[in-house]
Swiss-Prot record:
Keywords from the named record: Acetylation, Membrane, Mitochondrion, Mitochondrion inner membrane, Transmembrane, Transmembrane helix
Matches recorded under InterPro entries: Cox20
Coiled coil: none
The keyword Transmembrane helix belongs to this UniProt entry's keyword annotation: yes
Protein name: Cytochrome c oxidase assembly protein COX20, mitochondrial
Residues with PTM N-acetylalanine: 2
Organism for this UniProt entry: Mus musculus (Mouse)
A GO biological process held by the record: mitochondrial cytochrome c oxidase assembly
Amino acid sequence: MAAAPEPHETEKKPFKLLGILDVENTPCARESILYGSLGSIVTGLGHFLVTSRIRRSCDVGVGGFILVTLGCWFHCRYNFAKQRIQERIAREGIKNKILYESTHLDPERKMKTNNSS
């Protein structure tokens, strides 16, 4: 039998937006949703203050939410992917440095011997 969890150890369920997007574990999701919500309020309220049309202001607010959320999402994911590529390149460089250090394949060693000649 599996041991029952103790009362003070509650199992934490992830928060899923619309049952699809796991906001806690997906990179950039939380920030995108928060900025989209703020963009929705600003655009909807701003449009209402200018035109005093309620229905159109709600539509503008929804559009603002979609545009700001997608804009933040793509910007953040692009930066996240760029950072992962840079980390991978650095990791491979460090691995090669460790692997080839003090061997006849070491590029720094070849440069030093060519300069001293």
